[in-house]
Amino acid sequence: MGLSQSTEYGGQTSSSEKSNPVSDKTLEELSYVLAERFATKCFTPLELTHLKDNFFSRAIDQGGLKYWNEKTLSDFLGIPDSSESHCPLDAGPVIFRMVSYLGAFPFQNTLAPSVLTFEAMVKVVVLLTERYGKVLRRARRDRIRLLFGSLADVGRKSVEQHTNGDEVSEDADAPAPNSHVPGFAIDEPANDDYEDEEDDDLALAALESLDAIEVFKHDSRMDRAVYEARISADTLRRLLMLLIVISPLKPLEPVKIYTSDLTEERMKAVRSEADDIMAAFNREPSGGISYKEFARIVTSSFPYLFDPLTPLFEHLLFSRNLNLSQKRNRADSTASEPVEEEAPEDDLPSPPTITLPGSFESVILNSSVISHLSFFLPSSSESLNFLRGNVRLHPVFSTVAHGSSLTSFSHHVLTWSSGTLLVLEGTDPTGEMLTIGAYLPQPWKSPNSTQSSSKFSNSVLPCLFQLSPKHLLLQGNPSSTIQQQSNIPAAYFSTSSGISIGCQIPPSSRSNQKPPTPHGAGSLTIDVSLETAQFHVSPVVRNGVFLPPPPGSTPDTTVKTTIEIYNLEVWGLVPDPTTTSAEGGKSAVELQQAKWDFEAQEAERRRSVNLKTGGSAAEESARWLLETAGLIGDGAGRRAGGSV
């Protein structure tokens, strides 16, 4: 299954060429060989057929070289481009820059920006959909450095022996018939003193598969003190805005479902979330973001940030104008065929919603906030974010709908038998708005609860986070020692102290009931009136439920923020309905309704109990019943709580 149609070497490799040792090949030839291996080993025959149809039916022919330009790529993917009259995102140039860099893999140092030939597009799709495991077995499933390079601008150091007034060319927009063009300077060695050996895993694995390690070493043997690479704030913000808009995208779902109705109100929310995410990155004095900072924040705070790129580029593997009911000879693919037009925007379906109907509608969550959450919250499995894992949010409790009562909170939350997402918004003493939340994959438990019906894996850890005005994430502590300590639950509820997340629970005492105390790297406490919250963050302590945020994200000392709560919501996590229906059993919604029905029946029974009638035995029996229910006596104080 060759790649002859767009290669600049004039066709498939001949048998005599195949017999030559790899070390005798040029970089362009090695790049071509890798693309051919990707094509044959990383795609099914049907996927490769669709990819060829999509590419060649739209390709521009210049002197026998077929390629895509920025407009072709943007139009196919449905990405707003600067050439459009109304373009609030203007993400086309950023995506084109990225793929022009990735198309030169693994020789970005000398071949990037590449012309988007078919061979280049094969590598782009393989890298962005993470299909390279069948070829690059030694590579980490880690694209951070590669993605950084595809986004980075270059600032040249004032090193006299290397300057001579030369400028680094980064023009990736104008395609040229020759694929050997000046490289991106991000791949010029830059005296990186962090993770050098790990950074090149993908490239080394690619060249190892070609027996061309020596070629790579020769290509990289340059002065590592000449260039500094930085991602500009504008470039990253434009990419973030696109990712926020398309984060719910499913495979083969039209992108325009999410990009066709970008009203000013919608764009205001998108910009707000992008700015909150941008605030998490410390910038250089020049305003750019270094690789070290980019890798640190993406790894620790946004593990799923680039997930939307996978379904976006999987569109290339399905052609709408390929008629599978007829045999079509596409071996040489030299002629373009008419491309089936997309449905008019008026006929596009509405974007699906993650929130289920229930007792209230959110005043905190909107589509942009949910996209922000999907960049770091897992689903019932750690491998997928909660959007790609098809998790749904069921409305459980809201202060707007149910009031600021702990009794109401207990009635709605403690009867929910799956994980929960707690979010609140309010102001700090300066009047600045904050949005804080906690992701609790295991259900809250009442004191006498012994079982959990959560469909979420125990390996999915809780986390504490701040969404605005600056993104901050405190990951769950994976230590089994911490998880087994019953006095340090992820979340705790008590009618006497309120709600405590990430706190240490003191021993119970009849004479002196002490409130839970903040413990470890982070905690959130909410008073009994649900009006005030305290958010504690410590930069170094690691003995609690949550781990410290990335270094440099917070001050060097413990910070306590008092929040006047405006709104508080608890959302139930409903796993993928297709998975849960296959497993059988009742859903969390059905179980909650059953508990409410049981509580109603018990309440009716209690009304018939009269402590002042009957003999002493009847009175004692009735009192015992109410104490057991935690409604009167010492049992009420001991049992008025819950944890998760």
Swiss-Prot record:
GO BP annotations, alphabetical order: response to oxidative stress
Principal subcellular localization: cytoplasm
Keywords per UniProt: Cytoplasm
Bias (Acidic residues) ranges: 338-348
GO cellular component: cytoplasm; nucleus
Disordered: annotated segments: 1-23, 158-177, 329-352
Domain of life (superkingdom): Eukaryota
Coiled coil: none
Subcellular location: Cytoplasm
Covalent S-S links between cysteines: none
InterPro entries according to UniProt: TLDc_dom
TLDc domain sequence ranges: 363-574
Function according to Swiss-Prot or TrEMBL: May be involved in a process influencing telomere capping.
Family in the record: Belongs to the RTC5 family.
Annotated PANTHER family: NUCLEOLAR PROTEIN 7/ESTROGEN RECEPTOR COACTIVATOR-RELATED, RESTRICTION OF TELOMERE CAPPING PROTEIN 5
Annotated protein name in UniProt: Restriction of telomere capping protein 5
